[in-house]
Design a protein with these regions (language model features):
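S-adenosyl-L-methionine
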Residues: 1-25
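Helix-to-beta-strand junctions that scaffold the AdoMet/dcAdoMet cofactor pocket
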Residues: 7, 43, 59-61
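A conserved beta-strand element that flanks and buttresses the S-adenosyl-L-methionine
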Residues: 34-37
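A short glycine-rich, Lys/Arg-flanked "PGG" loop and its adjoining helix->strand segment in the class I
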Residues: 48-61
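Conserved beta-strand signature within the Rossmann-like core of class I S-adenosyl-L-methionine
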Residues: 62-70
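Short, glycine-/aromatic-enriched active-site segment of Class I SAM-dependent methyltransferases
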Residues: 76-93
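Short alpha-helix
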Residues: 93-111
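Core SAM-dependent methyltransferase catalytic element
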Residues: 110-133
C-alpha cells in the first residue's frame, strides 16, 4: 500500500512484538505506535510488558501509543467453542479480557499515561491514546 500510493516517511515492520530483543533491531524512533488486537490473545501479562517496555524504549520523547482493549464480549463462550487455541494444542481458547484499569496500569508502569479513550456503543471495544511522560 505504501509503494502503491507513493507515500514517503512511512514504514511497516513485522517483528515478534512479545520478544524484548525485537526492539533492539529497530533502527528508527517512531512517534506513534499502534498496538491493536493482540493483547486479548494472551493470558500472561509478562508478554504484554515485554511489548510495552520495548515500545517505551524506542518511542520518540513526544511519542504516543494507540492501543485497543476488549473488556467485554457478549459471545465470549461461543468464540471459545469455535476457535481453537492459537498455541497449537487443539484446546478451546478463551479470550483474556482486561479491564481498562488493568490495561492502563500496564502502560503507566512504563511512563505511558492514557490521555483519551473511545468506546463503542456496546462497551465491547476500546481505543486509547497514551502519551510518553
Amino acid at each position: 500500500v505504501i509503494k502503491k500510493n507513493n507515500w514517503e516517511n512511512i514504514s511497516f515492520v513485522n517483528y515478534d512484538c512479545f520478544n524484548k530483543e525485537t526492539y533492539k533491531k529497530i533502527n528508527y524512533t517512531p512517534n506513534i505506535v499502534i498496538i491493536s488486537g493482540v493483547f486479548e490473545l494472551f493470558e500472561d501479562n509478562n508478554m504484554l510488558e515485554n511489548t510495552i517496555s520495548g515500545v517505551a524504549e524506542i518511542l520518540d520523547k513526544n511519542g504516543a501509543v494507540i492501543y485497543t482493549g476488549q473488556p467485554w464480549h457478549p459471545q465470549l463462550k461461543q468464540i471459545a467453542l469455535v476457535l481453537n487455541s492459537h498455541k497449537g494444542h487443539g484446546k478451546s481458547w478463551l479470550m483474556r479480557r482486561r479491564s481498562e484499569k488493568e490495561l492502563d496500569s500496564l502502560f503507566e508502569n512504563y511512563n505511558l499515561k492514557k490521555e483519551k479513550m473511545l468506546i463503542d456503543n456496546n462497551g465491547i471495544f476500546t481505543v486509547s491514546l497514551a502519551e510518553l511522560r
